[in-house]
Amino acid sequence: MALCNGDSKLENAGGDLKDGHHHYEGAVVILDAGAQYGKVIDRRVRELFVQSEIFPLETPAFAIKEQGFRAIIISGGPNSVYAEDAPWFDPAIFTIGKPVLGICYGMQMMNKVFGGTVHKKSVREDGVFNISVDNTCSLFRGLQKEEVVLLTHGDSVDKVADGFKVVARSGNIVAGIANESKKLYGAQFHPEVGLTENGKVILKNFLYDIAGCSGTFTVQNRELECIREIKERVGTSKVLVLLSGGVDSTVCTALLNRALNQEQVIAVHIDNGFMRKRESQSVEEALKKLGIQVKVINAAHSFYNGTTTLPISDEDRTPRKRISKTLNMTTSPEEKRKIIGDTFVKIANEVIGEMNLKPEEVFLAQGTLRPDLIESASLVASGKAELIKTHHNDTELIRKLREEGKVIEPLKDFHKDEVRILGRELGLPEELVSRHPFPGPGLAIRVICAEEPYICKDFPETNNILKIVADFSASVKKPHTLLQRVKACTTEEDQEKLMQITSLHSLNAFLLPIKTVGVQGDCRSYSYVCGISSKDEPDWESLIFLARLIPRMCHNVNRVVYIFGPPVKEPPTDVTPTFLTTGVLSTLRQADFEAHNILRESGYAGKISQMPVILTPLHFDRDPLQKQPSCQRSVVIRTFITSDFMTGIPATPGNEIPVEVVLKMVTEIKKIPGISRIMYDLTSKPPGTTEWE
């Protein structure tokens, strides 16, 4: 069956062997093992003017050879090569004489096929690391002996296959292998993402020097392609577009306006009650200036009281469903997103009804982007990507509409930076094109809702590990079984750096009793947050180092924050009951307004890709003896720098953003009633996602 799948996919894509034409002559095939970054590989290859096509991992070798592909790239994936459900592939892909680059899981597959072994190590690597490379290897030609790369894996190569040599290392972990004579190369890291500083050079070396690609493939005018697709799909029907006022939905609407007659486009802005301060008014004004008439609907009440249908339980595989709690009583991030997505569609249907439009003659248009679909594991984007979180515009109901062919997503193959370029080409004003993204569910996913603390049986042991890490210079003098675990998970270089940091600074690190969404090893994680506090002024470079190190040692931690103010003496072990109520939302709305106002006035808004401001149910600085209840909440500032929103880094104060700008935000937010402490998110993506939910 796998052979049939691979064959039919290739034939349907337009390769015609009967008349002797090889549609993919000189192109590269990307075999998709279910990576979160599969589409980024595709984009990076095309940026280098080489045609690329994505096909299932099980595509047979003979089909690749017959179609004339010049080289093969195998993506990463969430599986283990030894897992019973590991995806099937044709091992002959390595022996048909085509150059192969195996990335992450792809490297482990290659090593296993040729007799090497792969093991799950005690160390996870999720984040940015320095690796040593052999720059005499063709893949790494022109690079330094040490390179900064993104690693995200738990399995590691143990025994290297015969005929292969190690060409890159991350401490004692194999980060690259090569068999130069067979033109087979493996990278445990991700050269396709921006966090790998010279990733583009590595891909260029593979495509041009190793595979001999010619670089004649230039991207066609995608604007015309989008317009052609819209006209073809819609015909004389009408299109309802739900406008948030963000870049994506605005560019989508501008494209629809360009492709269709004005009376065919119905632009609706739904105020869901989770907008930023004065957001709806400014959206309406900005779009009117573009000549787009917008119908604004205040639907806050419908959203607060919205429900959806859910499976009886995660384990229940039957079609039985249950009705969810109302949104204002829901704490689960997944359920919140599903309710919001479904309520959006219900209101859209009501609008269609009020306007006496026939539902079968109306399409729903969305500004959905490629990363949204990849993170939701939608089949449109990737056959196998592991679910990280449901995007509000990719719920079950919307998937059903998509199956019926009633959803138009002209930007589904675009990444955020490409949408901005397209927006400029369409003549949209710069302030609209360059504004920070704001998620469709709005502030609803920036409130960490909780009724009780998140404390599992691993809480005390993880706290003990964090204590050892934060006081490493003293801990090494007192032997402890957990100290050996810390040492086993770190390189000598890491340990030296830890010694240096903890000798100079008085730090304490501990778990916070909440959980947030992250992405670790191409899989979704829903894990603890680690808080760090200190009596010293923050040394941001050291804090960023700790934020990279801690999730590697503690796989149940996917986020690390610095807590402003005096050292936290008694970390909270309970939470302030928090739901999406009007009071909670107005607190967050004000905090978000203050932080973004200061960022805008500083002139640094353009240097930061996005800055979610998050409200958490944490009340610090209470005397446990007085048994004071938890009634305040704390705010997190999450700066994020990225080119594609698939990976990214926090802005380091004193580097990408002035320290005084951050401190001004802290001062102003602290004035808001009911705020306990302010925290700064130090986490890269991975292991933490851009948003906390």
UniProtKB/Swiss-Prot annotation:
CDD domains: GATase1_GMP_Synthase, GMP_synthase_C. One of its GO terms (biological process) is GMP biosynthetic process. The modification N6-acetyllysine is found at residue 9. Its EC number is 6.3.5.2. It is found in: Cytoplasm, Cytosol. InterPro entries: Class_I_gatase-like (IPR029062), GATASE (IPR017926), GMP_synth_C (IPR001674), GMP_synth_GATase (IPR004739), GMPS_ATP_PPase_dom (IPR025777), NAD/GMP_synthase (IPR022310), Rossmann-like_a/b/a_fold (IPR014729). The modification Phosphoserine is found at residues 8, 332. XMP binds at residues 337, 522, 610, 685, 691. It catalyses: XMP + L-glutamine + ATP + H2O = GMP + L-glutamate + AMP + diphosphate + 2 H(+). The modification Phosphothreonine is found at residue 318. Pathway: Purine metabolism; GMP biosynthesis; GMP from XMP (L-Gln route): step 1/1. Keywords: Acetylation, ATP-binding, Chromosomal rearrangement, Cytoplasm, Glutamine amidotransferase, GMP biosynthesis, Ligase, Nucleotide-binding, Phosphoprotein, Proto-oncogene, Purine biosynthesis. The modification N-acetylalanine is found at residue 2. GO terms for cellular component: cytosol. Its cofactor is Mg(2+). Coiled coil: none annotated. Residues 27-216 form the Glutamine amidotransferase type-1 domain. ATP binds at residues 244-250. Residues 217-435 form the GMPS ATP-PPase domain. GO terms for molecular function: ATP binding; GMP synthase (glutamine-hydrolyzing) activity; GMP synthase activity. The active site is at residues 104, 190, 192. Catalyzes the conversion of xanthine monophosphate (XMP) to GMP in the presence of glutamine and ATP through an adenyl-XMP intermediate. Homodimer. It is linked to A chromosomal aberration involving GMPS is found in acute myeloid leukemias. Translocation t(3,11)(q25,q23) with KMT2A/MLL1. This is GMP synthase [glutamine-hydrolyzing].
